[in-house]
Amino acid sequence: MERLADRVILVWGFKRSLLAIGAGAFAVLALPPFGFFAAMFLSFTLLVWLIDGAAASPESGLIGRLWPAFAVGWLFGFGYFVAGLWWLGHALLVDSEEFAWALPLAILGLPACLAIFYGLAVALARIFWSDGMGRIAALAAGFGLMEWLRSVILTGFPWNAIGYGLMPVPLMMQSAHVIGAMGVTALAVFVFSAPALFGTRQGARTGVALAVLLFAAHLGYGAYALYLAPRPAPLPEDKRPVVRLVQPDIDQAAKMDNDADRNAIFETHLKLSAEAPRNGGRKPNIIVWPETSIPFILTDNQDALTRIADTLDDDQILIAGAVRAEEMGPGTPVRYYNSIYVIDGRGQIIAASDKVHLVPFGEYLPLEELLTELGIQNVVEVPGGFSAAASRHLLALPGGLNLYPLICYEIIFPDEMTGDIKDANALLNLTNDAWFGMTPGPYQHFLQARVRAVETGLPLIRDANSGISALVNAHGEIIAGLDLGETGFIDATVDSLSEGFGSTYPRQTYFWLTEALLILIALISREGFIFGLN
């Protein structure tokens, strides 16, 4: 293995760049729909050796000394994000005449920007680089910090954080309840990088042993949480809500077509909602439709509310995604919100919640005046774009069920599970992944949603237009669901309700403690204070 390490360390020029990009791209096999987490062992082993060879002239300034390492990290990240996010281009092809020109920006431009975070992670690690296991601790700390920054800088976009590669199944998700997805990311990089120590021998015994212990603890805690830890007491049989998830699989082009029969789309949802339970099951208490499932402004269409009332029984509730319009007075443009409505059996809207975290260039246009003059517009055609709600609040349903609402990609942000979530007993995620067709995107989105359930300790009710719709318990296990591309409905019983984790602060604290510990290991190793590390 030392010979292989030497060859990688010494590779130069175009071959070096190609190897870095390839290592990043190969790591994507650890993500859904593949879930081959072992791929990241090879990718990060190669990355460590490439960083070992990222030398600069001693006479160079700080930036000059760190530039080769930054370049390696950027190339690795570029390969990772191109291979992991290429499917974003599918959304632009829904209206190809209008947006096909932006394909290079989505497929290459966004990955190039996101790769900067990985370049900075490697450059930061290079500052603490040593010959022993300290270098993989430094790399883990660098990636943990930069993945966290990626989730908060500008509007944030933490999609496909490295840690998800170490969480393909519920057994391997449970650590996120303690240290969060970003904490798992830091530990994952340490574990995935450990085989690189065999290539240089120094610190191999200590470093690999620690990595094995961390991986064993990761699995051990997962087994404890799934099979040994106490679970919430099940609700009495007659108190268990039955939730119907409606998945109409409406083609996105049809949803955007102004000439489409919107009533037909609406009736498709009503028909699936009205069908009798299968196998003699209980009728649903709660019926859920996906994001923007109501194809018109509901408050302007009393006939639609009447049709909903005709479909529902008096004791049933409909939760549906819709566009909400808010009149702001004479001479002021109408504001539009991506919203969730709760409608009772009489056709009355009894609760609503608006989306807080909007998708840039999809739901609103940054620097709108400038970009509009250049002919650039939102992918979603709403006059003036969507407005963001100032805050998120619970949807309190009759019977004491409090849902924490998250629309579309809001569920990928770990640090946004705040505020009223302490009073929630389930997460609600409405989305429309039909934008991305039969690509890896919806599978990646679903994994991140399941990890949010684990982090918060709350069951997840997720409804998607084209899939994946599912009821997920607080351990990330799928209770019932509909796969990508299926049309129909599924009735699922919520057996128990969780009180959750209270807030994100314990996880954030443990994440920063993990970062501090990794940096301490890197510093100690660099100074040679512990035998066998250098």
UniProtKB/Swiss-Prot annotation:
The active site is at 291 (proton acceptor), 355, 408 (nucleophile). The chain crosses the membrane at residues 8-28, 31-51, 69-89, 105-125, 127-147, 178-198, 208-228, 511-531. Keywords: Acyltransferase, Cell inner membrane, Cell membrane, Membrane, Transferase, Transmembrane, Transmembrane helix. Its EC number is 2.3.1.269. Catalyzes the phospholipid dependent N-acylation of the N-terminal cysteine of apolipoprotein, the last step in lipoprotein maturation. It comes from the Bacteria. It comes from Rhizobium etli (strain CIAT 652). One of its GO terms (biological process) is lipoprotein biosynthetic process. SUPFAM superfamilies: Carbon-nitrogen hydrolase (SSF56317). The keyword Membrane applies. Coiled coil: none annotated. It is a multi-pass membrane protein. This is Apolipoprotein N-acyltransferase. It holds the Pfam family CN_hydrolase. Pathway: Protein modification; lipoprotein biosynthesis (N-acyl transfer). It is an enzyme of class 2 (transferase). It is found in: Cell inner membrane. Belongs to the CN hydrolase family. Apolipoprotein N-acyltransferase subfamily. Residues 246-496 form the CN hydrolase domain. The keyword Cell inner membrane applies. GO terms for molecular function: N-acyltransferase activity. NCBIfam families: lnt. One of its GO terms (cellular component) is plasma membrane.
